[in-house]
């Protein structure tokens, strides 16, 4: 999973025709570390998406714009629009 490091890169990635998933995380977040322990099989299962990560603390304006109120959060984008949003607090199992 490639980490997004600039706002320009983020905007370019989400603008494409292909659906992408961006995982918002923070280095201090214990739930983010737990998610990393089981995310690889999920990425493999959903390989039709291109996966990226973005440190929420580096992009507070994106967190506000896309309502990333908790982390980790998975957001699906296509053609510059947010299609779906899963916050870890709403997931009952790793499969979700």
Model regions: which residues?
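CheY-like receiver
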Residues: 12-13, 62
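Proline-centered helix-kink/hinge sites
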Residues: 19, 37, 41, 72-75
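A short glycine-leucine-enriched loop at secondary-structure breakpoints
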Residues: 65-69
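Thiol-based oxidoreductase modules, predominantly thioredoxin-like and allied folds used
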Residues: 3-6, 24, 36, 40-61
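Non-catalytic, surface beta->alpha helical segment in thiol-disulfide oxidoreductase systems
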Residues: 70, 75-96
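Residue-level signal for alpha-helix termini/capping positions
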Residues: 14-15, 44
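Short, thiol/selenol-centered motifs that function as redox-active sites or metal-ligating centers
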Residues: 28-35
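Short active-site neighborhood of thiol/selenol oxidoreductases, capturing the structured segment around
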Residues: 15-27
């Amino acid at each position: 999973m490639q980490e997004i490091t600039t706002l320009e890169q983020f905007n370019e990635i989400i603008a494409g025709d292909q659906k992408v998933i961006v995982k918002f995380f923070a280095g201090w977040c214990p739930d983010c570390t737990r998610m990393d322990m089981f995310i690889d099989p999920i990425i493999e299962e959903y390989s039709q998406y291109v996966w990226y990560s973005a440190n929420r603390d580096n992009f507070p304006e994106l967190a506000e714009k896309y309502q990333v109120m908790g982390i980790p959060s998975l957001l699906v984008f296509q053609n510059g629009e947010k299609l779906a949003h899963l916050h870890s607090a709403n997931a009952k199992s790793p499969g979700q």
